[in-house]
Amino acid sequence: RWLLTKTGLGASNQFESNGYIRSRAGLKWPDLQYHFLAGAIAYDGSSAVKGHGFQAHLGHNKPQSRGRVWLRSADPADPPRMLFNYLAEEADKQAYRDGLRLTRELFEQSAFDPYRGEEVSPGKDVQTDDEIDDWLAKTAETAYHPCGTCRMGEDDMAVVDPECRVHGVNHL
């Protein structure tokens, strides 16, 4: 449709707005981020609904879980091995559980009445912590593009210092 009329889903950047929330009271800063989409479409272009829809993607701003990247072999042409290790820490799972429940509460507000249909994912039958954890384990992914970022700082987890000097390597 967009090729012919410059209208429809193709005219959108898909992520029309975002927002930040605290998954629980007492946090100094929001720990979760929303990406709101004015369409019900999957990354592969498929649609889980007939007609119009909207969705929210939830991301953790500062997860405790840590992954790793390491060499597959001595051949520099071999791609690296990557373990994202999402949701390895209980605190991260709890933040997503709380975030899902807050998202449901948000979309149950009367302002969404004219637009809201049935919950597609994870679906209204996913309610308990175990059910949410199972859904997360099957569907969680990053909204970002892993490409070689590294921690900056003076601590043991940092790769470079605040002046961008690589720890353990002189003059680089």
Summary of predicted features, one role per range:
Residues R1:
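Active-site-adjacent helix/loop segment of glycosyltransferases
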Residues L4-L172:
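FAD-dependent oxidoreductase catalytic-site/capping-region signature
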